[in-house]
């Protein structure tokens, strides 16, 4: 089977894991005035890509993906625990747990994931999103680059949806923003695949946005 179908499936915003419920701090950045228009939105997203995702989140996921594909369950355990420990706020931790749980439910209801993958995923209580994403890649026979590119696109599509609902950003403007960010996605994905998973980074602005969102008076999203 052509792997493009599995990659599109994993990257789709229609994947029933609840990603539309979360803004990952972007709604707080809008409320605080850090993001005001398409230009400042692009700055925020590029910073997230370059300073957080490409340097820590994605390399960690890439390591977990590689371990999952070859069945190195000890390495999977270590990477999953590191991902869990790196959630800096209650909202970000809850987001990862909820989406991971939903993706595990989906994989348990479908036939593709093999017995070793099912057994490992069942031991994660609860699973985080990175752990479940890695098992989806194993189930649908995606390599690390394919599964990671699906993850990057899923993230970008979600962020654009948040902007269209809250900035507000029109559909055409959102597509223009997406076009300008595609080279950044390429660079971030390539850097993540090169970086060792043991390296790290810190995105203090994201953590602060997430913390302030917990007490934000009016909000549409859960993070």
Name these PLM-found stretches.
Residues 1-223:
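Metal- and O2-centered redox machinery and metal/ROS homeostasis
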């Amino acid at each position: 089977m052509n792997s493009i179908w599995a990659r599109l499936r994993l990257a789709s915003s229609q994947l029933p894991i609840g990603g539309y419920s979360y803004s990952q701090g972007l709604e707080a950045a809008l409320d605080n005035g850090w993001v005001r228009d398409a230009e400042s939105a692009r700055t925020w997203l590029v910073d997230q890509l370059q300073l957080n995702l490409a340097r820590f989140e994605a390399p960690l996921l890439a390591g977990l993906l590689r371990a999952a594909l070859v069945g190195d369950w000890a390495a999977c355990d270590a990477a999953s625990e590191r991902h869990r420990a790196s959630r800096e706020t209650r909202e970000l931790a809850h987001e990862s747990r909820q989406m991971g749980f939903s993706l595990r439910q989906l994989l348990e209801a479908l036939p593709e994931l093999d017995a070793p993958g099912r057994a490992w995923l069942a031991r994660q209580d609860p699973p985080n999103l990175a752990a479940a994403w890695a098992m989806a890649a194993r189930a649908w026979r995606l390599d690390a680059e394919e599964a990671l590119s699906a993850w990057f696109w899923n993230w970008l599509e979600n962020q654009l949806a948040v902007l269209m609902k809250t900035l507000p950003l029109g559909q055409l403007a959102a597509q223009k923003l997406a076009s300008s960010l595609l080279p950044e996605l390429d660079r971030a994905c390539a850097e993540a695949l090169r970086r060792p998973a043991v390296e790290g980074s810190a995105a203090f602005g994201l953590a602060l946005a997430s913390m302030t969102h917990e007490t934000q008076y009016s909000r549409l999203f859960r993070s």
